[in-house]
Every structure is written in C-alpha cells, then in structure tokens.
Amino acid sequence: GRFWHTREPSVVWFFKNHWFNIIGIIRDHGIFYYCNIASPYVIDDEALKYIDYDLDIKVFPDYSYKVLDRNEYNLHKKKMEYPEKLREILEVELDKLRGMVENRVGPFAEGEVMRQYERFKENVLNQ
C-alpha cells in the first residue's frame, strides 16, 4: 500500500456500500474534492484498506469537475484483466459519484465539509 496526505486540513469519507471514497480539501480559496473510484473499505488489525481503480474525479469550488486518469484505468483493466462485472460496477459507481456532485448531496452538500471538520475539532481535538 501507499500513503497519501494533504498539506491542508481535509475530511475523508469512506463507504462500505459504494465503490469510491471522497476527500474534501479545505483551502483558502474554497473546498476542493478528490474522489477515488475504489473498492469498499475494510479494516483489519493493520489499517483501513481498499483497492484504488485509478479513475478519479477532481471537483472544484464551483462544483465543476474533471474525470482523471481514464488512460491509466484503461491500461490497468487490460493488463490486470478486470472482469466485465467489475468494469460495470466501476462505471456505475463513477456515474453515482457524478450525480452526487451535480446534485450537491452527501459530502458535496453546501457546508458539509466544514460542518464535519468543526465536529472533528470539537470532539477529537478538544479532548
């Protein structure tokens, strides 16, 4: 596994029933999101784990977005022989994620990243 970190405060959502995770990144000029198409997470004695399937969505403060790494995904799906069912799941989940961005629901709801960040500061940092 690899480690990834941001320089800015961030809030991360992992899902048991969705094939993506969402990182809300708090910057001076707005909230950015980096979304990974990935397996649902599992937790074991070592860490929280998931498989990253290369496809990503970067969402800007105005909620415009860009799908990233399509070429890398296409290369890996051939090289690693992703089964048809897996490819279908990943495309469906990518569409669900786009819908969440476009409809501004879940982590993309107005103010949600800051609400969760403030909640973290109150409940964890003030102990």
Can you describe what each PLM-predicted range is?
Residues 93-127:
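Cysteine/selenocysteine-centered motifs that mediate thiol-based redox chemistry or coordinate metal-sulfur cofactors
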Residues 53-99:
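A hydrophobic, small-residue-rich beta->alpha segment in the mid-to-C-terminal subdomain
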Residues 44-45, 77:
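A generic structural signal for short coil/turn motifs at secondary-structure boundaries
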Residues 24, 77, 121-124:
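Generic alpha-helical secondary structure signal
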Residues 43, 86-88, 108-109:
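Juxtamembrane/interface motifs at transmembrane-helix termini
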Residues 1-42, 55:
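Phosphate/ribose-recognition catalytic cores of enzymes acting on nucleotide-derived substrates
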Residues 47-51:
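Short loop/turn motifs at secondary-structure junctions and domain boundaries
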Residues 2, 13-14, 32-33, 64, ...:
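Intrinsically disordered, low-complexity N-terminal regions enriched in serine/proline/glycine
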